[in-house]
């Protein structure tokens, strides 16, 4: 595998560094963004929450002046001093009285420290809070020293006039002699809940006129300006609100020196300039206009006026002496200024801003260095404060990155030297120390032996490697690259330093010169210490553990190396024993006899050569390790036999461990490695196919490598699927145990509920710089941050920094539909997040209602990502969808009417034969569709049920009105195509067209009633429904659909029964065919029920002709009665007798027609089915008659 670079990807470690440095010292601090208005709080630690009693969601996005901690006893000049430090971007420490959430007070030292980015621009503020004990208060008689005098100069005021407000007055007094830092300002009535600040209007010429120069004499005194108006406590504080003037005796003690003046109404205040750039903005010329120092945040606080004789050398001072010396900053009332640069060319006016505003200063003015005192107080170490940016690890000079190319090449070189040491050290110790030729070479000097020179070079290389290891970075447990030399040295001392040091000592060089046997043996033993360098190889083995071929090759090399070592030992045993053996039975003597090179005691050079000895020894060890040997080289002495036994034992273990696992190694070669390379190949193919650009390509590859290192290629979902569900729940509960225990919302849940929640949680790993949620994304999940830190940005402005145990998303129980994100969420470091889908969470809460209330009450989002207008917009969208749905229905019906009128106009010229043919085809279609009417009923929405029932009920009456006159169609103004409408139970468009044809005269009848429209509005616009309410409404809707289906089934059965009774048909009145004499028209009966649905009014006689006015009146009345049935109204029943008499007359006249004409029509009867009709009376309800209606009397 390549060198792991995932650990060293650029990441923002700002939050982690601050927490690590502060939490260990039990600090209580907040972090504020200096580039936004009010310097909003974007992070607070747990110590601050415990100190104040406020939770983190309560503190986030509040101004860093901590207005919510202010109360009646909070000094205004202390608050103003904090505002001064924030405006000037300078470090300062102020003692302030704050209030707990429960209303109790505590005194706290507030320490403001600016944090800069790589350009030296202060991007954030760290505000640290320290308790002040009673002993410290007693030891400090005065927190602020009196003001030193300043020279009297012709100085003019910066006047801010508020003509609509009541202000305080002051009296002209003499000006002190020394105070070069003072800027005198007239302010309005103080805000009672914030350091910041009312809208300041641009000063006028009168406010900066020379006539006000003498007014400054009364302003600068050791005393404070006495408040002469009642100022209420902070609006947002939880403690009882009292009058501030009762709690400010120190502000009333100087009333004798500062009295009222009736001629002027203003309040004096003193502001200390924060930097030299502030003073550069002031000019002597009265026409100088000040430009807003922060171009992106114009807030309308432009100040102008003369200002001179100010010592810039004393400005921006942050030492304790200067803070105490120039103590007039404690006298500032609750207001904020935005000093601007001088610009004489033109005048820039900015729109007014909000009340609470602290304007971020200009970039170049935020270059104050953090003083040594700040570093001592915070104990931050050498790096003082981290920089808020995506940064690669800071590398000190002469420090080598552990993943650099040089280090990789050096490691391979050292590995080769280790292999050389492992091979030649045993060989030199066993074969060369007692060799006569080697002894002669040593006599001429250490450099005569080439092997000694190589050993010396190797020793030097290892010593250099030790020095390099002292300057090589490493990755700690937090996956951070450590480059501090001191930390590297400590880490190396605790690790491999001792082994490397012993292996690098050149022992043979240290004891060179003594030729005794004891020295020779000692040198041989000490040289074996170099074999400890092989431990370096173990450091690299895990990198190649995924490559089966590399592991197999490595094991084979280990096997050969062990055989080499054993061969050296085998020779050493025989060489040591040979002089003491009298019978010469050792394996060396046997070897000399076999190859014809016998030993001669008188000749030291006799016997086998070194090559023969080494090859024979190596042959013996290999044969013994792999088998029991062949016997040509055999042990003869006891020592040799014991060693042979040990070799056989080692051989059996080596053979079983190496060669027995060859198959497993090969399988791993095609398992883990195959998975890694296959996944990597997929990534590369994806990059190639989609032509991913290089920056994004590098991110993909680095994330894949890091994720593989992080999970070792294990898919947790696949692993969990192999276990039973109960075991999966236990595993998930263990994996999410920290989250479920630390989050307050999950406390008190039952074990079953926790198991269900754990099963729904998914773990997400995000690299630094990755955007988890984009602005505008649908919030489908709730996120819990378990490791790392993230930032939330709105328009590329950091609004919050979240760390461990923070929660972000939306309150899922408050909205029926998921909202959209209002910000981007981006990872600063490697993050682990637990997320649960919205539907899964609601499902669990629905299953455990007793836990639901507790969860929804205690769930506190650190940052709510839901857009502000999402809720109202969802309601408007639902209402708009309802209107669109209705418009689509109306337009669809109108199109159907147009097509229907066209068909009717085309059918006006059809003869009776075509009419009969269309009727027969329509009957077949009706028979085919009637069986499917139930499915149509079940698909109709509950809101459309009254409309549908009215339509079905009105259809038979329209057919009857048409057939009473033997007409197929009505006149052009209101005709209906009967053969297409009589059987259209399944087509809702046709069903609506039945109702809309006569509705042209009465448009209000086409739409549902007001009650129905109200029901539609409730069901379609009410979006804030819970899951249980939706289930209940669906159940009610299903019950209503079932009842409707049963009613329709009964209606269809009645229709089929009526169709079966009809055996004869009668031709219409205009037909030339006459009915037979035997035919007698049946009399129509009108069956009256207890609740009559409708009645038809008829006041005129009728003519069978379509041109007769009486006929048209009857048809009109019929259609009106149909519409009344559709809308559910009740009509009079007085006309039923009239209709019955008319029908009897019609039946008498029909006897003169030809019987053949009776067969031309056979119209099906539609049974009315109203919503309130019961099953018992549905069979006899309404008007029943046979189909044939040849005409009326008088034809």
Curated annotation (Swiss-Prot):
Instruction: State the coiled-coil residue ranges.
Output: 1027-1054
Biased-composition ranges, Basic and acidic residues, are 890-902
Location of motif Selectivity filter in this chain is 627-632
Show the SUPFAM superfamilies listed in the entry.
cAMP-binding domain-like (SSF51206), PYP-like sensor domain (PAS domain) (SSF55785), Voltage-gated potassium channels (SSF81324)
Keywords of this entry? Cell membrane, Coiled coil, Glycoprotein, Ion channel, Ion transport, Membrane, Phosphoprotein, Potassium, Potassium channel, Potassium transport, Transmembrane, Transmembrane helix, Transport, Voltage-gated channel
**What GO terms fall under cellular component here?**
monoatomic ion channel complex; plasma membrane
Which compartment or compartments is the protein found in? Cell membrane
The cross-references to Gene3D superfamilies, in alphabetical order and at most eight, read: 1.10.1200.260, 1.10.287.70, Jelly Rolls, PAS domain
Topology within the bilayer: Multi-pass membrane protein
Residue numbers spanned by region cNMP-binding domain: 745-845
Q: Which residues lie on this side of the membrane: Extracellular?
A: 434-449, 516-521, 571-614, 636-641
User: For this UniProt entry, which segments traverse the membrane?
Assistant: 413-433, 450-470, 495-515, 522-542, 550-570, 642-662
Keyword Chloroplast in the entry? The reply is no
Protein family per UniProt:
Belongs to the potassium channel family. H (Eag) (TC 1.A.1.20) subfamily. Kv11.3/KCNH7 sub-subfamily.
What the entry lists under PANTHER family is as follows:
POTASSIUM VOLTAGE-GATED CHANNEL SUBFAMILY H MEMBER 7 (PTHR10217:SF466), VOLTAGE AND LIGAND GATED POTASSIUM CHANNEL (PTHR10217)
User: What does the UniProt entry state concerning the protein's domains?
Assistant: The S4-S5 linker acts as a signal integrator where it both couples voltage-sensor domain (VSD) movement to pore opening and closure, as well as providing a binding site for other domains that regulate activation and/or deactivation of the channel.
The UniProt subunit note reads as follows:
The potassium channel is probably composed of a homo- or heterotetrameric complex of pore-forming alpha subunits that can associate only within their subfamily.
Relate the protein's function as given in its record.
Answer: Pore-forming (alpha) subunit of voltage-gated inwardly rectifying potassium channel. Exhibits faster activation and deactivation kinetics and slow inactivation at membrane potentials positive to 240 mV, resulting in the weakest inward rectification.
Q: Which NCBIfam families match?
A: sensory_box (TIGR00229)
Give the protein's recorded name.
Voltage-gated inwardly rectifying potassium channel KCNH7
Task: List the source organism.
Answer: Mus musculus
């Amino acid at each position: 595998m390549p060198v792991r670079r995932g650990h060293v990807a650029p990441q923002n470690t700002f939050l982690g560094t601050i927490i690590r440095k502060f939490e260990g010292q039990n600090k209580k601090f907040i972090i504020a963004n200096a580039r936004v208005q009010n310097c909003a709080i974007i992070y607070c630690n747990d110590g601050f929450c415990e100190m104040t009693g406020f939770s983190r969601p309560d503190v986030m996005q509040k101004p860093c002046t901590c207005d919510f901690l202010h109360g009646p006893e909070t000094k205004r000049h202390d608050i103003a001093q904090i505002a001064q430090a924030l405006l000037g971007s300078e470090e300062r420490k102020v003692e302030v009285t704050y209030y707990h959430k429960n209303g109790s007070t505590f005194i706290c030292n507030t320490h403001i420290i600016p944090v800069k980015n790589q350009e030296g621009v202060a991007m954030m503020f760290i505000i640290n809070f320290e308790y002040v004990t009673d002993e410290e208060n007693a030891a400090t008689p005065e927190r602020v020293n009196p003001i030193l005098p300043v020279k009297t100069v012709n100085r003019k005021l910066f006047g801010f006039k508020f003509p609509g407000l009541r202000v305080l007055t002051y009296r002209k007094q003499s000006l002190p002699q020394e105070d070069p830092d003072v800027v005198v300002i007239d302010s309005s009535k103080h805000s009672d809940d914030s350091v910041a600040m009312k809208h300041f209007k641009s000063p006028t010429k009168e406010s900066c006129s020379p006539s006000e120069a003498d007014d400054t004499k009364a302003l600068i005194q050791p005393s404070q300006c006495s408040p002469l108006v009642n100022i209420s406590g902070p609006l947002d504080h939880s403690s009882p609100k009292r009058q501030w003037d009762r709690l400010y005796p120190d502000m009333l003690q100087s009333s004798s020196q500062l009295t009222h003046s009736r001629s002027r109404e203003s309040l004096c205040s003193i502001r200390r300039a924060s930097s030299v750039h502030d003073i550069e903005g002031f000019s002597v010329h009265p026409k100088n206009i000040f430009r807003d120092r922060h171009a992106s945040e114009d807030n309308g606080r432009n100040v102008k006026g003369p200002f001179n004789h100010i010592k810039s050398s004393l400005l921006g001072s942050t030492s304790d002496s200067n803070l105490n010396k120039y103590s007039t900053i404690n006298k500032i009332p609750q207001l904020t200024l935005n000093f601007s640069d001088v610009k004489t060319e033109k005048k820039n006016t900015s729109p007014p801003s909000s009340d609470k505003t602290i304007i971020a200063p200009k970039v170049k003015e935020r270059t104050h260095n953090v003083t040594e005192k700040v570093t001592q107080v915070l104990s931050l170490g050498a790096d003082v404060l981290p920089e808020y940016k995506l940064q690669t690890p800071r590398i000190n000079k002469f420090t080598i990155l552990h993943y650099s190319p040089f280090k990789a090449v050096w490691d391979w070189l050292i590995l080769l030297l280790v292999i050389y040491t492992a091979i030649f050290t045993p060989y030199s110790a066993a074969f060369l120390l007692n060799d006569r030729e080697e002894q002669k070479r040593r006599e001429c000097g250490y450099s005569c032996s080439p092997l000694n020179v190589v050993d010396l070079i190797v020793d030097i290389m290892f010593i250099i490697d030790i020095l390099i290891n002292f300057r090589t970075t490493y990755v700690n447990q937090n996956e951070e690259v450590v480059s501090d030399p001191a930390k590297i040295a400590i880490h190396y001392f605790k690790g491999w330093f001792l082994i490397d040091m012993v292996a690098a000592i050149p022992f043979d060089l240290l004891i060179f010169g003594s030729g005794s046997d004891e020295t020779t043996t000692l040198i041989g033993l000490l040289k074996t210490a170099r074999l400890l360098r092989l431990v370096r190889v173990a450091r690299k083995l895990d990198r190649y553990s995924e490559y089966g071929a590399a592991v197999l090759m490595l094991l084979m090399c280990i096997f050969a190396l062990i055989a080499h070592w054993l061969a050296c030992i085998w020779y050493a045993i025989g060489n040591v024993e040979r002089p003491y053996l009298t019978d010469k039975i050792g394996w060396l003597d046997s070897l000399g006899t076999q190859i014809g090179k016998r030993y001669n005691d008188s000749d030291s050079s006799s016997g086998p050569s070194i090559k023969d000895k080494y090859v024979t020894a190596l042959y013996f060890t290999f044969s013994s390790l792999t088998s029991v040997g062949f016997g040509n080289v055999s042990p003869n002495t006891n020592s040799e036999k014991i060693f042979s036994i040990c070799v056989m034992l080692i051989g059996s273990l080596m053979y079983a461990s190496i060669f027995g696992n060859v198959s497993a190694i090969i399988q791993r070669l095609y398992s883990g490695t195959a998975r890694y390379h296959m996944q990597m190949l997929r990534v590369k193919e994806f990059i190639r196919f989609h032509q991913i650009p290089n920056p994004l390509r590098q991110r993909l590859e680095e994330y894949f490598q890091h994720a593989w290192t992080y999970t070792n290629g294990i898919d947790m979902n696949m692993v969990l699927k192999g276990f039973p569900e109960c075991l999966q729940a236990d595993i998930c509960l263990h994996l999410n145990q920290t989250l479920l225990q630390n989050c307050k919302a999950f406390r008190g849940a039952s074990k079953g509920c926790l198991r269900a929640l754990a099963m729904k949680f998914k773990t997400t790993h995000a690299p630094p710089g990755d955007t988890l949620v984009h602005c505008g994304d649908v919030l489908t999940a709730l996120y819990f941050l378990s490791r790392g830190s993230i930032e939330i940005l709105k328009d590329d402005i950091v609004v919050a920094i979240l760390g461990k145990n923070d929660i972000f998303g939306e309150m899922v129980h408050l909205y029926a539909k998921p909202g959209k994100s209002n910000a981007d969420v981006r990872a600063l470091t490697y993050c682990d997040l637990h997320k649960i889908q919205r539907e899964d969470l609601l499902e669990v809460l629905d299953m455990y209602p007793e836990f639901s209330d507790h969860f929804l009450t205690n769930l506190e989002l650190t940052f709510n990502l839901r857009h502000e207008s999402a809720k109202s917009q969802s309601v408007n969208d639902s209402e708009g969808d309802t209107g669109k749905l209705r418009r689509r229905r109306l337009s669809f019906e109108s199109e159907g009417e147009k097509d229907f009128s066209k068909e009717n106009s085309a059918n006006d010229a059809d003869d009776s034969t075509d009419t009969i043919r269309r009727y027969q085809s329509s009957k077949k279609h009706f028979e085919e569709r009637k069986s499917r009417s139930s499915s149509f009923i079940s698909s109709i929405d509950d809101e459309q049920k009254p409309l549908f029932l009215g339509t079905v009920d009105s259809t038979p009456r329209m057919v009857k009105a048409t057939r009473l006159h033997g007409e197929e169609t009505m006149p052009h103004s209101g005709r209906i195509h009967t053969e297409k409408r009589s059987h259209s139970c399944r087509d809702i468009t046709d069903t609506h067209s039945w109702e809309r044809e006569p509705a042209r005269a009465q448009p209000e009848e086409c739409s549902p009633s007001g009650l129905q429209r109200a029901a539609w509005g409730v069901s379609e616009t009410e979006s804030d429904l819970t899951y249980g309410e939706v289930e209940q409404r669906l159940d009610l809707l299903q019950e209503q659909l079932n009842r409707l289906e049963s009613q329709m089934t009964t209606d269809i059965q009645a229709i089929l029964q009526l169709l079966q009774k009809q055996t004869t048909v009668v031709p219409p009145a205009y037909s030339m065919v006459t009915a037979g004499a035997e035919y007698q028209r049946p009399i129509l009966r009108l069956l009256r029920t207890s609740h009559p649905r409708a009645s038809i009014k008829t006041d005129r006689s009728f003519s069978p002709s379509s041109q007769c006015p009486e006929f048209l009146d009857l048809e009109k009345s019929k259609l009106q009665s149909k519409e009344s049935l559709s809308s559910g109204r009740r009509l009079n029943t007085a006309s039923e007798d009239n209709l019955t008499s008319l029908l009897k007359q019609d039946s008498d006249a029909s006897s003169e027609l030809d019987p053949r004409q009776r067969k031309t029509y056979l119209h099906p009867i539609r049974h009315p089915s109203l919503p309130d009709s019961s099953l018992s009376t549905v069979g006899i309800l309404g008007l029943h008659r046979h189909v044939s209606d040849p005409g009326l009397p008088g034809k």
